[in-house]
Amino acid sequence: MIERGKFRSLTLINWNGFFARTFDLDELVTTLSGGNGAGKSTTMAAFVTALIPDLTLLHFRNTTEAGATSGSRDKGLHGKLKAGVCYSMLDTINSRHQRVVVGVRLQQVAGRDRKVDIKPFAIQGLPMSVQPTQLVTETLSERQARVLPLNELKDKLEAMEGVQFKQFNSITDYHSLMFDLGIIARRLRSASDRSKFYRLIEASLYGGISSAITRSLRDYLLPENSGVRKAFQDMEAALRENRMTLEAIRVTQSDRDLFKHLISEATNYVAADYMRHANERRVHLDKALEFRRELHTSRQQLAAEQYKHVDMARELAEHNGAEGDLEADYQAASDHLNLVQTALRQQEKIERYEADLDELQIRLEEQNEVVAEAIERQEENEARAEAAELEVDELKSQLADYQQALDVQQTRAIQYNQAIAALNRAKELCHLPDLTADSAAEWLETFQAKELEATEKMLSLEQKMSMAQTAHSQFEQAYQLVVAINGPLARNEAWDVARELLREGVDQRHLAEQVQPLRMRLSELEQRLREQQEAERLLADFCKRQGKNFDIDELEALHQELEARIASLSDSVSNAREERMTLRQEQEQLQSRIQSLMRRAPVWLAAQNSLNQLSEQCGEEFSSSQDVTEYLQQLLEREREAIVERDEVGARKNAVDEEIERLSQPGGSEDQRLNALAERFGGVLLSEIYDDVSLEDAPYFSALYGPSRHAIVVPDLSQVTEHLEGLTDCPEDLYLIEGDPQSFDDSVFSVDELEKAVVVKIADRQWRYSRFPEVPLFGRAARESRIESLHAEREVLSERFATLSFDVQKTQRLHQAFSRFIGSHLAVAFESDPEAEIRQLNSRRVELERALSNHENDNQQQRIQFEQAKEGVTALNRILPRLNLLADDSLADRVDEIRERLDEAQEAARFVQQFGNQLAKLEPIVSVLQSDPEQFEQLKEDYAYSQQMQRDARQQAFALTEVVQRRAHFSYSDSAEMLSGNSDLNEKLRERLEQAEAERTRAREALRGHAAQLSQYNQVLASLKSSYDTKKELLNDLQRELQDIGVRADSGAEERARIRRDELHAQLSNNRSRRNQLEKALTFCEAEMDNLTRKLRKLERDYFEMREQVVTAKAGWCAVMRMVKDNGVERRLHRRELAYLSADDLRSMSDKALGALRLAVADNEHLRDVLRMSEDPKRPERKIQFFVAVYQHLRERIRQDIIRTDDPVEAIEQMEIELSRLTEELTSREQKLAISSRSVANIIRKTIQREQNRIRMLNQGLQNVSFGQVNSVRLNVNVRETHAMLLDVLSEQHEQHQDLFNSNRLTFSEALAKLYQRLNPQIDMGQRTPQTIGEELLDYRNYLEMEVEVNRGSDGWLRAESGALSTGEAIGTGMSILVMVVQSWEDESRRLRGKDISPCRLLFLDEAARLDARSIATLFELCERLQMQLIIAAPENISPEKGTTYKLVRKVFQNTEHVHVVGLRGFAPQLPETLPGSDEAPSQAS
C-alpha cells in the first residue's frame, strides 16, 4: 500500500516568543498545551501561514473578537512577529519518501498599516540530518545566533550539493508544487480554491459547524465536473466562437465589400483624376504645339493679307476714281434717255392730240349739220304744236257753246266758228285784214308763190352760206396751220409764209429721210468706238495685272505663251488634285482606322488587364489563345486532383472528429445504447469504474478485459435476465459482469502478465491472449491522451484541409476567371496592340498632314498662277478680236461727223414730225390764203333772215290753206245759231276735242322730246367745241414744250439712248460691283487682318500661358509621378482604357466616386480628413496621398496570418476565397459541435448518479462516528424537483422545445435557461442573464441539495445545526464534516497527481477544552482510522496518553520574552483492535 505523506515538523524563526523553535509533529495527534498566552495560537498561526501564505485570507481572530465586524488592523499576524526576518517552515515527507521543506519568509513592513511581507519558498533534496533551524540561523556565539535573510539562505542552499531551493512569486505556483508533492490534498488553481481551503482550515481551527462550509457543501464535497463542464464550455465557446467567427466573417464580408467598394471607388476617384490630368497634360502639350504652329501660320497669313490689302487698296482707289466719271456719264445718259422718252411721249401726245383735233373737227362739222336739222324739225314741231293748241282752243270754244254741239247744226256752227277762227288767224298771219273766204284761194296762190320764193331764196342763201362757211373754214384752217407752224403773223402774210413753209418742209422731209441710215451708221460707229474704248480699257487692265506694258503686236505671241502655260498648269493642277485626293483618301482611311482602333483599344486594354491578372495569378505567360485553353485544361486537372485530395483529407478529418466525439462521451462509452442499458439494468459501465485508471495502466486493463471492456457491471445478474428477453436495441455483443460497482476489482479473472500482453484464463478450457494496445482507450487518461493526439492530428488535417480548400477555391476562382476571360476577352486579347498601331498611324497622319500642307501651298501657288494665266488668256481673248479697232485712230472723228449729220437729220425729222401733218393739210388749201372771206357774217345774217321769212311764208300759206279748206264751213253760219243746243253736235265736239287734245299732247311730247334732243345736240356741239378748243390749246402747249426740250424724238432715239445708258450702267455696275467687291474684300481683309492680329495676340498669349502652364504642371506632375512610383500604385492608377474617355466623363466618374467615398469614409476621421484635403483641384498629389492612405489603411487591416500579401486588391481576392472556405467550414463545424438536449440530460444524470454513489461511500466512513449524544453523522443528497423536471423534459419532451435549441441566436446555455424559465415561471431569476443561468444549469452540483444530518439520541436523524447540538457535539460533527471534505478532495484530485502519492492529511482544533474525554478519544480514533494528523490546542485537560504533547509556558527573562516548550510522546497501551478501515496500528507510547 502507498504510505500517506506526513508533516514531520513545524519550525518558527523569530516569532513572538519563539526565536528558533521546531515542533516535531506526531503522525496522528499533536497537542499544544499551555495557559493563556502561552503561544498555542501563535504556533498554529505559523503553521497556517506556511500552509496558506495569502494575506487576503489570513485573519487570526482572538476569542475576544467574537461578534466584532472587523478584527485588529494587522489581522493577528503582524503582532505575532518580531522585528527582522521571520520564518515559518513545514518539514514534510511524502509517499515517495521525499523530504520537502516548505515555508515562508515574513518581515514586518514599517508603517502604521502594520503590513507584513511574505515570500514563499521550498527546499527539496535536503538530507535528513539537517534540521530546519540550522538552515535559517547562523550561530554567532554560544548564546548568540543570527537569522539569515532569504538571499543568504538561497546562497547557502545552493552551496549544498543535491539541494534545490525555489522561491515563488505567486501563491498559485507555491500551492501547485505542494499539490504535486503531496503536501496538500487539492490543487488550488485560483483565489476561490484558496479561499475554500482557508475556510476549511479556519473551520477546523475554531471548531464547530461552520456555516460557511455547510451552506456550500456542494462546492466542498461535490467535485466540479471539469470534464463535462469543460466539454460544455468548450462546446459553447466553440459554438460561440464559431458564431462569432461567422458573424465576424459576415462583418468581414461586409468589410470586404466595404474594402472592395472603398478600393474601387478610391481607384475610380484617383485614377479618373490621374488619367484626366495625364490626358490634360498631353492635351496641353498638343495645344502648346498647335498654338505654336498656328502662331507661325497666322504670322504668315497676316503678312500675306497685308500684301493683299495693299494691292486691293490701290485697285480700289483706281475704281473710285473711275466711278465718278462713269456716274457722270451714266447720269447724262439717263438724263438724255429721260429727255428722249419725254420728247417721245410729247410727240406721241402731239400726234394723239392732232388726231383728236382732226376727229373733233369732223365731228364738229357733222354736229353742226345735225343741230341745223334739229332746229328745223324743232320749228316744225313748234308750228304743229301751235296749230294743235289752236285747234284745241277752238274746239274748246266751240264746245263751250253746248247748244251748238247738240246737233249737226251745232257741228256746223263749230265748223263755222273754226273756219272763222282760221280766217282770223290767216288775216293776222298774212296781215290781210280784208281777207275773206272767197279771196282766200287767190291769196293762197300768192302766198304759196311767196313761200316758194322765200324757200328758193333761203336755199340759195344756204348754199352761199355753205360755200362761204367752207371758204371761211379753209382759210381759218390754213391760217391756223401757218400760225401753228410759223407762229403768230398777220392774215395778209399768211400766203407768203405758207409757201415758204411748204418749200422748207420739202427740204426737211428730205433730211428726215436720212435719219435712219445715219442713225444706223452712227450706231455702228459708236459700237465700234465703244469696243475700241473697251479694248483699250481691257488692254490697260491686262497690262496692269500683268505688271508690264505690251504692244499690240506682242499680244498674239503672249496669248500663245499663256495658253501653253495654262495647259501646263492645268495638268499640274489636275495631277495635284488627284494627288491631294489620294492623300486625303489615305488620311480619311487613317482617321477611320484610328477611330476604329480607338474604339477597340479600351476592349483590348481590358482584355490585357484581365490577361495580366491571370498571368499574375497563375505565374504563367500566355502568347496565344491556345496557351490559355491548354492551361485551362491543366487547371481543370489540377482542380480535380486538389478536390480529390481535399475530399480524402476531409474524410479523414471527419473520421477523426467522429472518433473524438466518440471518445469524448462521458464514462468512456462508445455506444450511447450502453448508457441506456446500464441505466435500465441499474448497473454501471465498466469503463466508468476504471475511468480514473492512469495512462500507464490503461494498456494493461484494456488487454485484461479485452472485448468486455465495454461491459456493464450489475449487482446481481439474476435480476437482469428478465430485461434481456426481447432486447434488440443493443450492440451485437453485450457483456454483463456481476459485482459491486462501488468496490469492484479485477479479481474476476485469472491472469498472467506477459511482455506487453496478458493471458486471461476465462475458464479451464478457454484462455484469451491479448496484447497491450498501442493506443489504449481504456480510462479517462488514455482517452484524453488519445483525444489530444487526435486533436493534434485534427489540427494538422484541418490546416491541410484549409490549405487544400483554399487551393481548390483559388483554383476554381482562377478557372472562373479563365472562363470569363475566354468568354469576354479571348477574341481580342492576342490581337496586335492597337495603341502601338495608333501611334504609327498618328505619325503617318502627321506626315500626311505635313505633306498635305506643303501640297496645298504648292497647289495654291500653281492655282494662283493658273488663275492669273487664265485671266490673262480671257482678257486677251477679249482683246485680240479688237486689235483692228485698237489700230483705227480715225474712228472717233468719223463718229463725230456722223453724229453732227445725224443731229441735223434728226432736227429735220423732228420738224417734219412736228409740222408734217400741218404742212400736209396746208398744202391742198394753201390757195385759200390768197383772199380773206370777211362777208361771212353778213351772209350768215341774211341766211337767218331768209330762214325766218321762209318760215313766216310757210305759216301764212298754211293758215290760208286752212281757210281754203274750211271755205265750205263759212256757209254754216246759220247752223251755228240754230243748233247751239243740239246734243249730237256736243258729242262730236267733245270727240273732236279729245282728238285735238291727244294730237296736242303728241305734238307737245314730240316738241319736248325734240327740244331735249336739240338740247343734247347743242350740248354735244358745245362739248365738242370745248374739247376742240382745249385740245387745241394743249397741242400748242405740247408743241412749245417739245421745242423747249430740244431733243429730236425719232423712232430709234430712245433705243440708242437706252443702249447707251445701259452700257454706261453696266460699266458703272461693274465698276461698283468691283469696287464693292474690293471694299468688301478690303473690309474682309482688314477684318481678317484685325482678326489675325487679335488671333495672333491671343495665340501668343495662349501659347505663352499654355507653355507656362505646361512648365508649371510639369513640376507638379513630376511630383505626382514620383509619389506614384515611390508607393507602387502606378499600375492601379494608370488605367490606359480611361485615356479614351473625355474630360467630362472622367470628371463625372471622379465626382461620383467622391460622393460614394464621402459616405464610405464618414466613420474614419483620418481618411475623411485626407479625402477632404484631396478635393483641392489645384493639388492633384493630395489625391495620390489619399489613395496611398486608403491602401495603407487596408494594408493595416490585412490579417497577415491568414493572407500573406501587402496588396489590398490581392488581399480582397484571397479574403473572398478564405471567407468562403471559412463560412463553409464553420457552418459544418457548428452542426458537428451542436449537442442534443437528451445527451445533456444523460450526462448530468450520470454525473449525479456517480456523485450520489460517492457520497454514500463517504457516509459509510462516518457511520461509527459519535460525539456525546450524536450517534452517527451522514450527508443527505437529493435532486431538486424543478431541476429533475428540467432533466425529464430534456430527455423525453425535448421535441416540444426545439425552437429554443435550434435557434442560431441562442447558445445552448441560453436555450437551457429559457427552457428552465418556461418550465418554472414562478421562480424569479433576478438580474442574472440567461447565459449565467444556463451555465449554472450545466453544472450538475446545482441540481443537488445537500445537508448534514446527525442521529442524536431519541430525536433520530435531524439536520445538523449548531443550535440543536452542544458545543462538543457541534465541534465533533464539524470535524467529521471536514474530514469528509478532505477525503472528497483527495478522491477528486487523485487523477490529477501521480498514483504513487497519497497526500498529507492535517486538521487543527484550537480551544479543545470544550470537548470531553470521550469526544477527544473519538477524534483520536478518527485520526488513526483515516491516517490524519491533528493539531490540538488545549489548556490542561488533554491527557498526554496518545500522540505527542507540547507544554508551552511563556516566560520573561531579562526583559526578553520567550516560550518554554516541553514535549512528551504518548504512553497509552495499544488497543486490542483497530477501528474499521484503519491502515496502521496506533503508535506506541514512549
From Swiss-Prot:
One of its GO terms (cellular component) is nucleoid. The keyword Transcription regulation does not apply. Residues 326-418, 444-480, 509-603, 835-923, 977-1115, 1209-1266 form a coiled coil. This is Chromosome partition protein MukB. It is found in: Cytoplasm, Nucleoid. Homodimerization via its hinge domain. Binds to DNA via its C-terminal region. Interacts, and probably forms a ternary complex, with MukE and MukF via its C-terminal region. The complex formation is stimulated by calcium or magnesium. Interacts with tubulin-related protein FtsZ. It comes from Escherichia coli (strain SMS-3-5 / SECEC). Keywords: ATP-binding, Cell cycle, Cell division, Chromosome partition, Coiled coil, Cytoplasm, DNA condensation, DNA-binding, Nucleotide-binding. Belongs to the SMC family. MukB subfamily. The hinge domain, which separates the large intramolecular coiled coil regions, allows the homodimerization, forming a V-shaped homodimer. Signal peptide: none annotated. NCBIfam families: PRK04863.1 (NF003422). Gene3D superfamilies: 1.20.58.850, 3.40.1140.10, Immunoglobulin FC, subunit C, MukB, hinge domain. Plays a central role in chromosome condensation, segregation and cell cycle progression. Functions as a homodimer, which is essential for chromosome partition. Involved in negative DNA supercoiling in vivo, and by this means organize and compact chromosomes. May achieve or facilitate chromosome segregation by condensation DNA from both sides of a centrally located replisome during cell division. GO terms for biological process: cell division; chromosome condensation; chromosome segregation; DNA replication. The gene is mukB. GO terms for molecular function: ATP binding; DNA binding. Residues 666-783 are annotated as: Flexible hinge.
